Amino acid sequence: MADQPPPPPTAAPPETEPAYVTRPLDASTWEDFAALVDANNGVWGGCWCIGFHPEGLGDRSSATRNRSLKHAHVRHGTVHQVLIYDGETCVGWCQYGSPAELPRINNPKAYLNDLTELPDWRIGCIFTGKDHRRNGVARAGVAAALDAIKDAGGGLVEAYPEQVEGREPQRGAYLHTGPENLFEEFGFKRDRRIAKWRWVMRRRIP
């Protein structure tokens, strides 16, 4: 019998995003959060994800000052932040909170123009560690934050992402509030423009 031709190669299964675990930032996970920040140069030069909080960054901002302020918020329970884990390693986060908890958004003057209703919740800073980008970390964080908001009673949620279509690719620091298309995946809609490339996007969660 003549040799049969070998069967065609089986196509490789499509790549899927890793299965992440999410946990809230609190006293029990502070060291995991701090390790991620330290591994990424304090995050954008030492922000420590304090920029949206009432204290903000300011002229006297330093990594030491910002770390201390963030730790105080964690101890006092005045922070809402989802940490994303790959195994036992914290690889990113998604910050959220009320306008009172996160009052310092970007472009505040433009934001107040045409404001008709304050949101119940804001999504602030989104961060992914440098070795884990483009693997769905931000998506997992936003999903977990929205689940937490739903569990807390829902309401009107705002995000302040950057438009990515129609412009040159941007480095991560410019996308610290997330890209617009990420929030479109979760049903957010444009409300109004507050900067050349930044939009207020909204979604109501029942």
Predicted features and spans:
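Conserved acyl-donor/pantetheine-binding loop and adjacent beta-alpha core of acyl/acetyltransferases
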Residues: 72, 76, 85, 89-129, ...
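Conserved GNAT acetyl-CoA-binding A-motif
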Residues: 142, 149-172
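Conserved acetyl-CoA-binding loop-helix of GNAT-fold acetyltransferases
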Residues: 123-128, 134-151
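C-terminal "cap" of GNAT-fold acetyltransferases
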Residues: 174-206
